[in-house]
């Protein structure tokens, strides 16, 4: 998507779609800038007749009888004194989607105080997200019915913020594409190849380990999860390192390209959408992509322990005792609690790099989805100050996270095993918390760490807000926003 700024000599008559993001007010006063003359008068009459007040989430599409302008799209922002970047993002998405649904690939956009960087960034994100649809496997005639937004002109916007918003929105679409691919297409080797392609495109350092190297590196927990699959594991390590980096952040993503549950096999209906068990991995790859394209001043490491959890003859078993990279032993009492085993070795490795901070992101527990629903994800941390920075980034991105406690000593006891240092599943109650406590055992001492549990938030079963059905790319923009704000 191409995006540019128009100054005060805004030429509305040269564009097919005029999108106005309007703050709430009386129909007679709702802003219709930059419309002029007869077009403005006509749109005002429609606004008054429809009693359109610019409430958040409301959209009015006006067909315009003009030689070049075909539509005026007015999207409500709600009260200006309560205006947030998320409202701008949603309104811009709605306006751009309305243009695309009418076969228009370009639009102009205006809003109150467009020069505000946060508003410009959010508007560009919304427009970029409006172009998303995972349609590569549809018949050609079905593909051709969808119009993508290719060009956006913003009146009096902030140029740097608009470009950042474009990158963030397009990186989330890239993340969604990767997460939406089925297990028959994306296995660990293919995911590693995708990471290599990304590295080559952006000039990132890239290291890929095969199954022999993984075993040689003493990643016993990770290797055990991969043992039951005909598709071998791949360990992915990407690095973006600008000159004079301000610091170093490590991102660790869960990368199960498909999760059958292993020998503790899932019921068939629970296997649906398990192509999305790699969503954490896709999010960290999308985040390092965004960081590199925005040329952010922080060194970023993206780590993925990619594997497939299958019930083959060589699969790991309940009661097995595994040894992780840091020497800790783990009793397996549920082979479907596999993501934390792959993350354990990945977190050990990330800690050895001595970053200033670590964030892991994973579709980890059904317990988190039960607690918070499918549009809010869980946040856990060993450092409240760092956790608050991630929450601030999530608020700016519009991705909802809620901090859950990790200070209950009784729950911590449940993670212990009489036969090993830890047990990989501590039972049903407080399952999201005990999973986070398990992961904490593999984070280096004194390293600020945040764990993001995006189970259920990674996949939209029905369209809502700026999400279509399928992978959401949830968490990618929060990670990128965190790095941008550090």
What are these regions, as identified by a protein language model?
Residues 1-255:
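Short amphipathic alpha-helical segment within the helicase RecA-like ATPase core
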Residues 51, 106, 192-486:
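A generic structural signal for tightly packed, nonpolar segments enriched in small/aliphatic residues
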């Amino acid at each position: 998507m191409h995006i540019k700024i128009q100054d005060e000599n805004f030429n509305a008559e040269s564009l097919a779609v005029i999108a106005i993001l309007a703050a709430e007010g009386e129909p007679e006063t709702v802003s219709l800038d930059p419309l002029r003359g007869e077009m403005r008068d006509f749109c005002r009459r429609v606004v008054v007749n429809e009693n359109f007040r610019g409430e958040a989430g409301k959209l009015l599409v006006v067909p315009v009888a003009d030689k070049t302008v075909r539509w005026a799209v007015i999207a409500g922002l709600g009260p200006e004194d309560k205006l947030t970047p998320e409202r701008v993002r949603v309104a811009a998405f709605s306006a751009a989607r309305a243009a695309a649904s009418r076969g228009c690939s370009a639009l102009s956009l205006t809003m109150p105080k467009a020069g505000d960087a946060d508003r410009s960034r959010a508007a560009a994100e919304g427009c970029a997200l409006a172009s998303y649809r995972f349609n590569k496997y549809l018949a050609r005639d079905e593909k051709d019915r969808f119009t993508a937004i290719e060009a956006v002109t913003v009146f009096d916007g902030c140029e740097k913020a608009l470009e950042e918003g474009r990158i963030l929105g397009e990186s989330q679409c890239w993340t969604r594409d990767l997460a939406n691919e089925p297990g028959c297409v994306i296995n660990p080797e293919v995911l590693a190849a995708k990471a290599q392609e990304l590295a080559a495109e952006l000039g990132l350092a890239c290291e890929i380990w095969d199954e022999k190297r993984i075993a040689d590196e003493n990643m016993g927990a990770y290797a055990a999860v991969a043992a039951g699959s005909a598709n071998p594991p791949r360990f992915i390590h990407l690095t973006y390192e600008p000159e004079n980096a301000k610091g170093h952040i490590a991102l660790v993503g869960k990368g199960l390209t498909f999760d059958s549950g292993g020998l503790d096999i899932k019921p068939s209906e629970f296997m649906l959408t398990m192509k999305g068990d790699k969503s954490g991995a896709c999010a960290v790859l999308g985040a390092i992509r965004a960081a590199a394209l925005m040329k952010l001043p922080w060194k970023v490491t993206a780590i993925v322990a990619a594997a497939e959890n299958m019930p083959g003859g060589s699969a790991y078993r309940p009661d097995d005792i595994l040894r992780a990279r840091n020497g800790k032993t783990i009793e397996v009492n549920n082979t479907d609690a596999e993501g934390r085993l792959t993350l354990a070795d990945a977190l050990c490795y990330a800690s050895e790099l001595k970053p200033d901070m670590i964030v892991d992101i994973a579709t980890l527990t059904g317990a988190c989805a039960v607690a918070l629903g499918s549009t809010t994800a869980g946040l856990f941390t060993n450092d409240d100050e760092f956790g608050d920075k991630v929450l601030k980034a999530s608020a700016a991105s519009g991705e909802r996270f809620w901090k859950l406690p990790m200070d209950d000593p009784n729950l911590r006891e449940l993670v212990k095993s009489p036969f090993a240092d830890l047990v990989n599943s501590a039972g049903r109650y407080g399952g999201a918390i005990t999973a986070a406590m398990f992961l904490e055992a593999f984070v280096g001492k004194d390293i600020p760490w945040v764990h993001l549990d995006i189970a259920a938030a990674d996949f939209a079963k029905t369209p809502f807000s700026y999400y279509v059905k399928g992978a959401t790319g949830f968490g990618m923009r929060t990670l990128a926003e965190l790095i941008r704000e550090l």
